[in-house]
Amino acid sequence: MISGAGAVGRHLASDLANRGHNVTLIEQDPAVLEIAKEWAPQVDHMIGDACEPWVLEKAQLNTADVVVASTGDDEDNLVTALLAKQEFGVPRVLARVNHPDNEWLFTEQWGVDAAVSPPHILTAMV
């Protein structure tokens, strides 16, 4: 399951689906979800807020092997990660860190197995 159907989420969803993975993409903005449907028609699309437990239950998160919280909002990504790990027992949870100052929060205590911080990755590559 991937939360956030912006550029990062929809590209990731498409790539994973093309590699044979079953992917559910959750997005709360209908306009953004419509773009994702065109970009990645081979994945399941769901309108909703991934910070809401009932949305994750409807997405059958308890059967997911991996969750990627890829929204542009760090708080939302942390809430989604924590719910995925604590409430639904997802084995592997990855989260996008949008603001480097928040990276210290993205730990196993918050349900995050691996945090991805694009600014730090780019800095490390220079």
What is the predicted function of each stretch?
Residues 1-126:
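Cytosolic regulatory regions of ion transport systems
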